[in-house]
Swiss-Prot record:
Cofactor(s) recorded in Swiss-Prot or TrEMBL: Mg(2+)
Name of the protein: dITP/XTP pyrophosphatase
Domain of life: Archaea
Organism: Pyrococcus furiosus (strain ATCC 43587 / DSM 3638 / JCM 8422 / Vc1)
Positions of substrate binding: T7, S8, N9, D10, G11, K12, S66, F139, G140, Y141, D142, K162, H167, R168
Record family assignment: Belongs to the HAM1 NTPase family.
Subunit structure: Homodimer.
InterPro entries xref list: dITP/XTP_pyrophosphatase (IPR020922), ITPase-like_fam (IPR029001), RdgB/HAM1 (IPR002637)
Biological process (GO), any one: purine nucleoside triphosphate catabolic process
Binding-site residues, Mg(2+): E36, D65
Catalysed conversion reaction: XTP + H2O = XMP + diphosphate + H(+); dITP + H2O = dIMP + diphosphate + H(+); ITP + H2O = IMP + diphosphate + H(+)
Function comment: Pyrophosphatase that catalyzes the hydrolysis of nucleoside triphosphates to their monophosphate derivatives, with a high preference for the non-canonical purine nucleotides XTP (xanthosine triphosphate), dITP (deoxyinosine triphosphate) and ITP. Seems to function as a house-cleaning enzyme that removes non-canonical purine nucleotides from the nucleotide pool, thus preventing their incorporation into DNA/RNA and avoiding chromosomal lesions.
One Pfam assignment: Ham1p_like
Length: 185
């Protein structure tokens, strides 16, 4: 089965391939542009994207949106994570966190799958914001996020280690389970 992943992010595609190729699913990156609405939840953003793309893509496809929610910043950057990353970056987040003791945060990922119907798969991971950027792997906020139970950032982990605990890894596991069950039908 071929599955389009509507994204320009090679890191997301690499992570999805590791989960889905064992099911015989060929994940193909398809970098189509689609509007990302400013909404209250990641789920709303993903559902809008699926509905916008469904008449433009001729194969089953997935999109994914994720956000970093920092407790001391009232959930900021949250649904605006991509925009905030592009504008103030990791240094901007670390500057906002200067002198703040409560560094608790969580990442949330929502994968939307369209096969004639809309299906959502959600994953979350709790952790904290590090005091500085660490690590060379991953992408986005990975160099400043330390998941609970670890002393290293996502950027200091291998793809396999990160996938075993990450928000996207958890959402991909849910999608994998669903696909495994429904591919048989």
């Amino acid at each position: 089965m071929e599955l389009f992943f509507i994204t320009s992010n090679d890191g997301k595609v690499r992570e999805a391939k590791k989960f889905l190729e064992p099911l015989g699913i060929n994940v193909i990156k398809k970098p189509l542009e689609y509007p990302e609405i400013q909404a209250d939840t990641l789920e709303d953003v993903v559902v809008f994207g699926l509905n916008w793309l469904k008449d433009k893509v001729d194969k089953p496809f997935i999109i994914e949106d994720s956000g970093l929610f920092i407790e001391a910043l009232n959930g900021f950057p949250g649904v605006y994570s991509a925009y905030v990353y592009k504008t103030i970056g990791l240094d901007g987040i670390l500057k906002l966190m200067e002198g703040i003791e409560n560094r608790k945060a969580y990442f949330k990922s929502v994968i939307g799958f369209y096969d004639g119907e809309i299906h959502l798969f959600v994953g979350e991971v709790r952790g904290r914001i590090s005091n500085e950027k660490r690590g060379l792997h991953g992408f986005g906020y990975d160099p400043i996020f330390v998941p609970d139970g670890f002393d290293k950032t996502f950027a200091e982990m291998s793809t396999e280690e990160k996938n075993s605990v990450s928000h996207r890894g958890k959402a991909l596991k849910e999608f994998y389970r669903w696909m495994k069950e429904n591919l048989k039908k």
